[in-house]
């Protein structure tokens, strides 16, 4: 899920990271040998920095093994590159500094390609969408229009401090906005009839319905209320790797594998992606 505060933590590192780039660039140079066309830290192994705490996108399963959408996609990537995959699980705030310090080849944690981050790393094209939708009880017949939901009679829930909370207030200003510190509590408020709708990411609705007998449904708006995208990050200067990553994403997007992986792991339909 996209917390506004989650990404702010990395901003404090920008100045230090920028200085680190200069140090690393002077201290060492990448190997451009024919046997290492993507300039990997260890030839033959793709080392990826992750923060495995965001189920179902990326997490540790019951056996302590990396799992989720990102992991399935990375395994397909490593297979296509004919290399081994090595995942390093770190705190979120250590990912970009670690990438700049060449502790791994890329970061896969659904990063938004913000101007601040672009100063220190290079991004691939988007590989994961974060679609905010509105969900209602399955027996609710409220039309899927902004006008119908932007009404003083409606109460709409969201996760406290999230993009969803901002969307509720911006898109439905006449409705009562009710935010919760716990995502499940926001869902249950609607499922039990104490609220009318919830703004949430589409895959989180799918996860809730798995264990709650499909008590909620997505309101049939023509498109999501809002879509953000996450990209892979690589070290600045490694054009060969970022070019391959973007090409791979386009390939699996066009052949349907991306949608298959998303449905398999997220339990939801892949939202619209930028065209290749």
Task: Name what the model sees in each region.
Residues 28-36, 163-180, 217, 249-276:
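Ligand-binding clefts/hinges and TM-proximal coupling segments of bilobed small-molecule sensing domains
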Residues 137-156:
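Flexible hinge/capping segments at coil-to-helix
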Residues 31-110, 119, 264:
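Extracytoplasmic small-molecule ligand-binding "clamshell" domains
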Residues 58, 62, 74-83, 146, ...:
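Ligand-binding cleft/hinge of the Venus flytrap
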Residues 71-80, 140, 162, 229-269:
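Extended ligand-binding regions for polar small-molecule ligands
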Residues 128-136, 206, 210-249, 268-276:
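Periplasmic-binding protein-like
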Residues 1-43:
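Short, low-complexity disordered leader/linker segments with a strong preference
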Residues 93-94, 110-120, 169, 191, ...:
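A ligand-binding cleft/hinge motif common to bilobed small-molecule-binding domains
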């Amino acid at each position: 899920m996209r917390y506004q505060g989650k990404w702010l933590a990395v901003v404090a590192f920008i100045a230090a990271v920028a200085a680190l780039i200069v140090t690393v660039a002077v201290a060492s140079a990448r190997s451009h040998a024919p046997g290492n066309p993507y300039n990997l830290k260890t030839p033959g192994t793709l080392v990826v920095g992750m923060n495995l705490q965001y189920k179902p996108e990326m997490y540790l399963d019951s056996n302590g093994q990396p799992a989720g959408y990102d992991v399935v996609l990375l395994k397909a990537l490593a297979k296509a590159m004919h290399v081994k995959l090595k995942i390093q699980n770190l705190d979120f705030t250590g990912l970009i500094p670690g990438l700049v310090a060449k502790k791994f080849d890329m970061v896969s944690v659904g990063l938004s390609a913000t101007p601040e981050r672009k100063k220190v790393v290079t991004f691939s094209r988007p590989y994961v969408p974060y679609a905010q939708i509105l969900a209602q009880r399955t027996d609710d017949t409220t039309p899927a229009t902004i006008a119908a939901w932007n009404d003083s009679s409606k109460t709409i829930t969201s996760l406290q401090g999230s993009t969803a909370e901002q969307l509720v207030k911006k898109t439905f200003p006449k409705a009562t906005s009710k935010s919760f510190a716990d995502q499940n509590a926001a869902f249950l408020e609607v499922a039990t009839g104490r609220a009318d709708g919830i703004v949430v990411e589409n895959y989180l609705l799918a996860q809730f319905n798995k264990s709650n007998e499909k008590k909620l449904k997505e309101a049939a708006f023509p498109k999501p209320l809002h879509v953000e995208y996450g990209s892979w990050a690589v070290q600045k200067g490694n054009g060969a790797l970022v070019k391959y990553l973007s090409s791979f994403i386009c390939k699996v997007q066009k052949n349907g594998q991306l949608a298959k992986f998303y449905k398999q792991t997220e339990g939801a339909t892949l939202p619209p992606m930028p065209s290749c």
